[in-house]
C-alpha cells in the first residue's frame, strides 16, 4: 500500500503520513488509531503501537469471567448450545480451548488424557498421534489445511507462540510439511473426515468472530462451528442426542 493510498483511506494528507513515517512528525493518539483501523491492525497490536508512540493503550483486555463480559459469555453459550447436536468450540488467539458444546466429546473420544486436560490446545489435540489424528480418515489433507492456516496466522501476527506451535505440529507424522494433498473432485471445502464408533463422519467448518469488539480478549476469540457434510453424519449426531449420548464438554 502506498502512502497516498493509506492517506486517502484514512482521511489524512499524504504529506502528514510521510512526515509520520520518516519521524519528522509525532502522530497523535487519534492518528495512530485512525491509521491502525484503516490497516485493520489487531487491537492488541494497536495498543502496542500506542505505547510505542508514547500513549496509553486504548483497548481494555478483560478476563472472560469478569462481570463486564457477562453478555459475551451469554452470547457464546447461546451459539454453542444452539449449534447442537453438531460440534462447536471457542478458541483464543493461540488456539487454546475456551469453551465447547456437548457434541465435542464425541469427536475427541479416545484421545490421551494429557491432551484433553486444561489447558487444551485444539490444534495439538487434532494432530497429535495420541489425539484425534489416528481416527482422521483424511489426515494428510486435514493436517495440510490446519498447518497452512496456522502458518498464515503466524506470519500476519508475528506471534512467536504461533510459530513455535506450527513447528511442533509440523513435526508430527501424517504428511509432508508444506504439501497439500489434492482435494476430492468437486470438493467445495476441505472436510474433516473422522471415524467415530464405527461410523465415518464428515464435517465442514466455519469460523465466527465478534465483529464490533473493542476489547482485546473479545477480539481474539473465534467460534469454530462444524456442520455435517453428509446426511449420515447429521443422522449419527441426532441419534446421539436422542439417546442422550452427548455429555458436557471438558
Where are these regions (language model features)?
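Short amphipathic alpha-helical surface patches that mediate protein-protein
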Residues: 22, 50-54, 96, 167
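Hydrophobic protein-protein interaction segments
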Residues: 68, 77-86, 91-92, 98-250
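Recognition helix of helix-turn-helix/homeodomain-like DNA-binding domains
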Residues: 10-26, 34-36
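Residue-level signal for the short linker/turn that defines the boundary of a DNA-recognition helix
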Residues: 1, 27-30
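An N-terminal domain-cap segment
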Residues: 19, 60-75, 80-82
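Short amphipathic recognition helices of helix-turn-helix/homeodomain-type DNA-binding modules
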Residues: 30-33, 37-69
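Short basic helix-loop element that most often maps to the first helix and adjoining turn
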Residues: 1-9
Amino acid at each position: 500500500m502506498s502512502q497516498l493510498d493509506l492517506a486517502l483511506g484514512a482521511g489524512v494528507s499524504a504529506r502528514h503520513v510521510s512526515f509520520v513515517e520518516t519521524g519528522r512528525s509525532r502522530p497523535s493518539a487519534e492518528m495512530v488509531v485512525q491509521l491502525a483501523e484503516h490497516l485493520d491492525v489487531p487491537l492488541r497490536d494497536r495498543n502496542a503501537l500506542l505505547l510505542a508512540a508514547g500513549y496509553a493503550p486504548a483497548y481494555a483486555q478483560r478476563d472472560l469471567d469478569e462481570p463486564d463480559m457477562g453478555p459475551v459469555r451469554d452470547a457464546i453459550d447461546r451459539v454453542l448450545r444452539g449449534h447442537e447436536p453438531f460440534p462447536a468450540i471457542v478458541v483464543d488467539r493461540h488456539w487454546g480451548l475456551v469453551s465447547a458444546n456437548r457434541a465435542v466429546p464425541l469427536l475427541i473420544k479416545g484421545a490421551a488424557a494429557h491432551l484433553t486436560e486444561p489447558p487444551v490446545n485444539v490444534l495439538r489435540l487434532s494432530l497429535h498421534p495420541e489425539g484425534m489424528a489416528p481416527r482422521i480418515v483424511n489426515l494428510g489433507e486435514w493436517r495440510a489445511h490446519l498447518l497452512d492456516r496456522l502458518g498464515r496466522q503466524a506470519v500476519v501476527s508475528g506471534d512467536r507462540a504461533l510459530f513455535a506451535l506450527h513447528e511442533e505440529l509440523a513435526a508430527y507424522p501424517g504428511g509432508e510439511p508444506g504439501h497439500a494433498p489434492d482435494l476430492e473432485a468437486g470438493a467445495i471445502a476441505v472436510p474433516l473426515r473422522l471415524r467415530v464408533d464405527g461410523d465415518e463422519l464428515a464435517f465442514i467448518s466455519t469460523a465466527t468472530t465478534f465483529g464490533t469488539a473493542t476489547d482485546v480478549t473479545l477480539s481474539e476469540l473465534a467460534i469454530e462451528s462444524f456442520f455435517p457434510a453428509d446426511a449420515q453424519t447429521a443422522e449419527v449426531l441426532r441419534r446421539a442426542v436422542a439417546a442422550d449420548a452427548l455429555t458436557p464438554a471438558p
